[in-house]
Amino acid sequence: MSELRFTADHEWLRAEADGSVTVGITPYAQESLGDVVFVQLPELQAYAQHAEVSVVESVKAASSINMPLDGEVVEVNAVLDATPERVNEDALGAGWFFRFIPQDAYAIHGLLDQDAYDRLIKANAQA
């Protein structure tokens, strides 16, 4: 499994061997949301970075999932339609949201690594 990268919006990304990138929300985001009850998955199409592509709803709130990089969504985790609780059970695994082909294959390296993301969470906790 490839090293995870993160966004400041608490999404994780994992580069796959086939050139695609898998996206989900971090355990921090999942815990902040509480029990996930619905996930609206994106359409299979191209999106610009920061475009809203998905929505996750919980018992506490609804939150947008934004496209982390320019690219084309090529697969969604349709299992989440019937079992959105997978996000609660395995946010970094079976609870993934979608896969996309990035316009720039190297852009993922410009996102936060684990250490930088941990510092972000710590800063948020102190704010």
From Swiss-Prot:
UniProt record similarity statement: Belongs to the GcvH family.
InterPro entries: Biotin_lipoyl (IPR000089), GCV_H (IPR002930), GCV_H/Fam206 (IPR033753), GCV_H_sub (IPR017453), Single_hybrid_motif (IPR011053)
Keywords in alphabetical order: Lipoyl
Cofactor(s) the protein needs: (R)-lipoate
Top-level taxonomic group: Bacteria
Source species of the chain: Pseudomonas syringae pv. tomato (strain ATCC BAA-871 / DC3000)
Quaternary structure note: The glycine cleavage system is composed of four proteins: P, T, L and H.
SUPFAM superfamilies recorded: Single hybrid motif
Any one annotated GO CC term: glycine cleavage complex
Protein's job: The glycine cleavage system catalyzes the degradation of glycine. The H protein shuttles the methylamine group of glycine from the P protein to the T protein.
Co-factor note (free text): Binds 1 lipoyl cofactor covalently.
Name of the featured protein: Glycine cleavage system H protein 1
Occurrences of domain Lipoyl-binding (ranges): 20-101
GO terms (BP aspect): glycine decarboxylation via glycine cleavage system
Residues with PTM N6-lipoyllysine: K60
